[in-house]
Amino acid sequence: MLEGEAKFVKNHLPPACPARSGRGHAFCLSVCDRCGPAGATPMSREKRSFAQEVCVKSAGKAMQKTGMLWAGCRVGVAVSGGADSFVLLKSLKIRQGIVPFRFELMALHLNPGFEPRSHATLLPWLAQEGIAAHLEVSDFGPRAHSEENLCHSVCFRCAWLRRKRLFELCARYGLTHLALGHNAEDLVATFFMNLCRNGRVDGMSMCEPFFNGGLHLIRPLLLVEKKYILKAARQWDLPVWANACPSAGHTARSAMSETLSGLYGLTRDARRCIFNGLTRWQLDKNSPPENGKDDSPGDCPPHCGGN
């Protein structure tokens, strides 16, 4: 692992904080009770635009319907630097002041190594928002594009390395959840990729347990269309930066998105119907039954995280 630009934040940690131990770089503003207040904090009702409301309320709907969060959760949010992950983190921060229980947030950023200083604007924003974080520079991107990667696609290898490291960080910091910023476009593209390439009828789970339930992978923005996320990111003035990966825009997912754009043109309402149908289907699939009894292996406990 390459040592990166985030090392200066290490000194922000109080001696008693568990985030200080171990390798890597982190700072703590609210990650534990020993370092300061954690979880939900009183906050005034800010005026939000329509796009911002869509993001915050849709995240709340996903949280409530699937029971993805509960009291005492410690949620690690994977922040890549794109609009999706920034809006996810901002929306969860707002929902801390809405839900009737306490949960904690920690941003996890793994710089892939193409531009080691690309995340320079992230740290001041996190400090301003009062969000704990772990930031590090890796070599995952260059490794995925090197001769070392003989068997897998570039995206598969890079994603596998990042996911493995994120799981390690969740274990180090005692996080119960890992939140990813996938949106409705990602759900639709994944559904058709699974159908056309693998012969499977499957999408992206909103709440999925790993390690015998020790960690839950969640996707609170899976009901939100990308256009609302982009608009909300601009309105919140989030410090989004460009993706420096040389393979960006040349992936199987981007090719599927282009194919789907042709499908959307078949009828006037094709896109709306496809999005509404698949998001409802995925939400129903990941929601526990009304009586609270759940026999499905992939669903989460029926806790409440909505309005």
Segments the model singles out, each with a brief description of its role:
Residues 5-8, 14-20, 27-191, 197-200, ...:
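ATP-dependent adenylation/nucleotidyltransferase module used to activate substrates
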Residues 54, 161, 224, 251, ...:
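Conserved active-site and cofactor/substrate-binding residues in soluble primary-metabolism enzymes
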Residues 105, 178, 185-265:
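Catalytic subdomain that performs nucleotidyl-dependent activation
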Residues 114, 140-142, 208, 224, ...:
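Residue-level detector of flexible, active-site-proximal loop/helix-junction positions
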Residues 118, 152, 192, 196, ...:
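Alpha-helix boundary/capping detector
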Residues 158-171, 204-213, 260-280:
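Short, basic, helix/turn surface patches
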Residues 238-307:
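The feature marks non-catalytic terminal segments
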